[in-house]
C-alpha cells in the first residue's frame, strides 16, 4: 500500500528531526545530558535527551492528524489516531552514549513505511546531532541525510553519487562492546578490511556507507529496526546492498 499523498512525508521528517535536534541541543553539558530516566522499550538505558527528542517527534506526529502506527526505541509501538498501515519508525537519539559524552556521532533517525518490512520503507531521514552545541548555534546544526524510494539518496540536498565496487579499505563496526569484539576477532580479521572504525551509531555508520566514506558495515549483534530503518534506505538508494 502506498503512503497517503495528502502528507508531505519528507517535510514532516524535516520538521520532526529539527524539533528533536532542538530538544537535545537544549541540554548544553554532559552532566545535563547524562541524567537517566529508566530503560527504553528496547532495554537500553534511556537518558533525558532520549525522552526529550522522542517527545518532540511525537508532538509532530500527533499534529499530522493521520492514523498511523509509531514504533520508537523508548515507547515501543504506539497506535496514533487509532492506528493505521502507515508506520513511523523512530530512534530519537541513535548513539545516545556519544551524545551524552559530547561525541559527534549521534543522530535522529526517522523512517516512514507503508508496511511492516524493511522493504516497505518509503522515506528515510537521518539528522546529525552535535550535542556540544545549544539550539542558538544554528550554523552548525549537523548534516541532514535522507532518501526517498526510487528517487535517490541525499546529503544536505545534494544527491549522493552511486556507489561502486572496490577494495574493502575501511569497515564500520557497530555494537563494538569489548567482549563482542574479542569473540568475533577472527571473523573480523577474515573479512579482509585494511582498517576498522567503530563510531557508535548504526544509522550514522550506514549513512557514511551510503556516501562511500566507509566501504561496508558489520554489526556484532542483530540490529533493531529503529536503528537501521531510515539509513538502510540511503544505502540501497545509493546502489549498495543491505
Question: Where would I find each of the regions flagged by the language model?
Answer:
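N-terminal subdomain of lithium-sensitive/metallo-dependent phosphomonoesterases centered on the IMPase/IPPase/PAP
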Residues: 1-93
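An extended, acidic
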Residues: 20, 148-151, 160-242
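Short, conserved micro-motifs enriched in small and acidic residues
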Residues: 44-52, 100-102, 200, 225, ...
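Buried hydrophobic packing segments
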Residues: 57, 61, 108, 112, ...
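Short, Asp-centered acidic motifs that coordinate Mg2+ and/or phosphate
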Residues: 69, 123, 215-216
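General beta-strand structural signal in soluble alpha/beta enzymes
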Residues: 69-73, 99-101, 196-200
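DPxDG-like acidic metal-binding loop motif
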Residues: 83-150
Amino acid at each position: 500500500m502506498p503512503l497517503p499523498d495528502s502528507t508531505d512525508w519528507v517535510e514532516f521528517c524535516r520538521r520532526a528531526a529539527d524539533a528533536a535536534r532542538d530538544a537535545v541541543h537544549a541540554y548544553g553539558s554532559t552532566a545535563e545530558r547524562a541524567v537517566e530516566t529508566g530503560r527504553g522499550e528496547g532495554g537500553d538505558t534511556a537518558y533525558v535527551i532520549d525522552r526529550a527528542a522522542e517527545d518532540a517527534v511525537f508532538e509532530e506526529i500527533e499534529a499530522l492528524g493521520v492514523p498511523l502506527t509509531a514504533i520508537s526505541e523508548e515507547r515501543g509501538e504506539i497506535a496514533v489516531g487509532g492506528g493505521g498501515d502507515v508506520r513511523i519508525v523512530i530512534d530519537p537519539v541513535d548513539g545516545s552514549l556519544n551524545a551524552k559524552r559530547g561525541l559527534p556521532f549521534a543522530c535522529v533517525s526517522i523512517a516512514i513505511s507503508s508496511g511492516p518490512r524493511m522493504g516497505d520503507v518509503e522515506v528515510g531521514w537521518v539528522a546529525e546531532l552535535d550535542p556540544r552545541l545549544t539550539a542558538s548555534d544554528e550554523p552548525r546544526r549537523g548534516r541532514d541525510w535522507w532518501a526517498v524510494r526510487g528517487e535517490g539518496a541525499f546529503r544536505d540536498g545534494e544527491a549522493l553519487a552511486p556507489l561502486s565496487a572496490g577494495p574493502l579499505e575501511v569497515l564500520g563496526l557497530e555494537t563494538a562492546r569489548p567482549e563482542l569484539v574479542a569473540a568475533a576477532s577472527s571473523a573480523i580479521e577474515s573479512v579482509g578490511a585494511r582498517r576498522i572504525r567503530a563510531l557508535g551509531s548504526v544509522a550514522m555508520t550506514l549513512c557514511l556507507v551510503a556516501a562511500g566514506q566507509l566501504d561496508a558495515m558489520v554489526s556484532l549483534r542483530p540490529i533493531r529496526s529503529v536503528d537501521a530503518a531510515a539509513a538502510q534506505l540511503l544505502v540501497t538508494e545509493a546502489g549498495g546492498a543491505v
